[in-house]
Amino acid sequence: KKLVDTQGALTGVRNDVALAGLNHKLGWRGTTNTLLNFGEGTFPVGQGGYDGKGSGAVGYLVGQPGKGLQCMFHMMNEARIGVGMAATMLGMAGYYASLDYARNRPQGRPMGVGGKDASQPQVAIIEHADVKRMLLAQKSYCEGALALELYCARLVDEHHTAGGATADDARLLLEVLTPIAKSWPSEW
């Protein structure tokens, strides 16, 4: 929003960057994803700006010329795996809360040879077949997602520490698995 000098101190000069909107997205809802307009003259920069009309946003080169997007994706790939890991952990927390509830919530009577026995005490809902099925499905999704996230973390380590073909194989596999590691746990 405000420009900084070479020492990182605020100059008080407003950069010509304006919020155009918020994107709807999958993943961390608390981390916003925005559309920005640069250099449209909404906040004129200096005496006449960079185009002589007051518009122009100040930006900084990331990486080598023509390689900035590549640098950004390199940084974001591990963050995308982190989003998937966070979604996995939320799913695991939900599973453990569901499991605890199912173990402690009594409802219904046990089935005997002649059907339900009203003289027997109620059983926990974890004893019901449909509740068991739902808990097992929840556990399967969570543990499968965790296995995928841990495998991706291992591939990141191999990509950074292994040499030659092993590092290249890990990188190629990560290119395929990273979008899945983010989206699949976030969706389910």
Regions of interest found by a model, annotated:
Residues 1-188:
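Internal glycine-rich alpha/beta core junctions
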